[in-house]
Amino acid sequence: MYDKASISFVVLHYNTYQETINCVNSILHNVHPENVNVVIVDNCSPNGSGDIIRDTFIDEKRVYFIPLNQNTGFAVGNNAGINFARTELKSDFVCCINNDTLVEQNDFFSRIIDIYLETNAAVIGPKVYLKDNSYQLFNTKLETVSFYRKKLSDYKKSVFLLNLKYIFSKLGINISKNKNNLSNNKSKFDSKDSSFFETEHTNVVLHGCCLIFTPVFFEHFSGFSPDTFLYREEEILYIDISSVGLNNIYSPKIYIKHLEDAATNSLFDNNYKKLIFVTKNKIKSTRVLIQHMNSMNQTGS
């Protein structure tokens, strides 16, 4: 049934053109079948890098370029690529992958098909290595509403403190950095044994740097919930999938490399400004997540 299945990789681009070029080339060089396409969505990059991306791949028939007229964020930007992949390219599978990642596995797509046929998962997440070849750490658990309310309170306090530090830094007054900065807390999942990452897991919150949407997903949904700009998309996706009785899966049979946060870093010349931006978006998205959990009667675990 899936001997001639097709897949499109949706790569959301913003500013960092070399990372996007490297990501797309890694797909083209390592995922060989003719029924593989790449859809690059330029999220209205202000530095003109979208033109560089378009011109770089203008002669590559498997690469499509979609410029957006405003920065729509992660969910809506990816949805533009998903919609093109589904309606124009008729792709069976869609892989939304960060532009600061590399696909280094030449049987990546064939393994995706095998995993899907074995599990009927709506969304598949790969094992993720960082540039030093360590595992990408992330929390696979949907927490309780009370947990996220506490996080919301913490984020608000953090924004207040970061704004103060930013003002003082502009005045030339250095304040020692808080090692426990609330906007940059490590997940409690970080303490998990590394064997976790070499084991298949069903119905976990997946990492958003690479999410593979399968045919059964598109029987119920057209893409991400459009209500967030940045952050918490993975938890909301998990809730949506669970609400219709579908499963997702983390599989170590497929893997990518993640270079982390290149696009977000490109926005700022000041670390405080970056942290304020990140934390404000976490506040907005955590509010959306709490509303989503309440509307779906999801209590977390």
Feature names for model-found ranges:
Residues 25-35:
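Short, acidic, metal-binding catalytic loop of nucleotide-sugar glycosyltransferases
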Residues 26, 42-53, 70:
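A conserved acidic beta->alpha catalytic loop
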Residues 68-88:
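Glycine-rich, basic loop-to-helix element that forms the pyrophosphate-binding segment
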Residues 90-102:
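Short beta-strand-to-loop acidic/aromatic patch adjacent to the donor-nucleotide binding site
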Residues 102-140:
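Conserved donor NDP-sugar-binding/catalytic core segment of glycosyltransferases
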Residues 162-184, 190-213:
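A recurrent flexible, glycine/aromatic-enriched loop bordering the glycosyltransferase active site
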Residues 196-199, 204-223, 227-254:
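A short, conserved alpha-helix in the catalytic core of glycosyltransferases
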Residues 235-301:
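Active-site-adjacent helix/loop segment of glycosyltransferases
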